[in-house]
Amino acid sequence: MRTEADFAIIGGGIVGLSVAHGLLKQGCSVICIDGSDTDFRASRGNFGLVWVQGKGIRAPFYAAWTQNAARIYPDFVSELSQETGVQINYNQAGGYEYFTDPQTLSQRMDEYKQLKKALNGDYPYEFLSSSQIRAAEPMIGGETIGASFYPYDGHLNPLQLLKALASYCQKKGLSHYLGEELKTADKKEGVFRIVTKKGLTISANKVVISAGLGAKKIGPLFGFLGLVSPQRGQILVTEKISPILNRPSVTIRQVDEGAIQIGDSQEQAGFNDNETQAQMSRIARNAIKVMPKLAQLRLVRAWGSLRVMSPDGLPIYHQSHIMPGAFLITCHSGITLAATHSTNLSLWLTGHKNAPELSRFSEDRFHA
């Protein structure tokens, strides 16, 4: 495998491989320096949503970025499947957020009204009454009083997406080094030199840090603040059954193989990714309020995983002031943003004339 390239990407999860996919399509040579299988990897614990609604309520530019990502997703997935032969079970028929509390529902209505205004009307949501949602989803009932619906929301199998991205990148010449840990990094005469603890030496014209929670340690080597922290989420999985849900919600979805996934937790637990009885019980209770049928199903699996969170919850896209040519990319929506990371963010990395303007996502916002 090569040790010199146009780009060295540090971190080979969904974010890193999505970026690599876009760079390779532009004709760049790319090396990926990846950690071990025991590292914390949000890509493997992902809920599988490609989701817009609820994001960017207080940051309309992020809502617009996410909405664009969802709109280009069908073409992204279709092309990736054709190029690799890997089936990606992706469904974009819209999605729901269910409400059991009138005050929360009213607040969400006001928030979406303001967000739609900020986006000049380009935010095609709607709210459904309890009778409307029951007509659309007969299994939804219990204490559900209504739901929001957004047409570009959807879901997929995240492991299939990860496999397809890895397959494409390998096919197009990605040099992927596994089980590596950075030791030193410097830049001389316009070229980055990265040395790992195993002695691997990589030279690259540009560097992309997409190492998830590893950015906290790796980022400062390139002059970044590396302000990321873990947030634990827990997921419950039922036995496989025949299809009973037409569309996913932000907390309940039926996967392509028939099981129902339930997830509804945001916990500050440090780097502890274990599941807990208290949270699993709470998640199950809340889900049954919305979908009583769940009480009749057997739970067969559960897991915890760590999200990658910035201080304000928004992505960070930043070029180092100290070492220009080094870029930090981090977000907690790597699945949702995969299409735009490949298609648009890669243009920003190469300095293309059609690159998006991303200054509001930079680390500079944390200095204010």
Question: Which functions belong to the PLM regions below?
Answer:
Residues 15, 38, 214:
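Conserved Rossmann-like nucleotide-cofactor binding loop
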Residues 48-132, 136, 286-288:
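Dinucleotide-binding Rossmann-like beta1-alpha1 core, especially the glycine-rich loop
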Residues 5-32:
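N-terminal Rossmann-like FAD-binding beta1-loop-alpha1 element of flavoenzymes
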Residues 148-198, 202-205:
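Helical element adjacent to the flavin cofactor pocket in flavoenzyme catalytic cores
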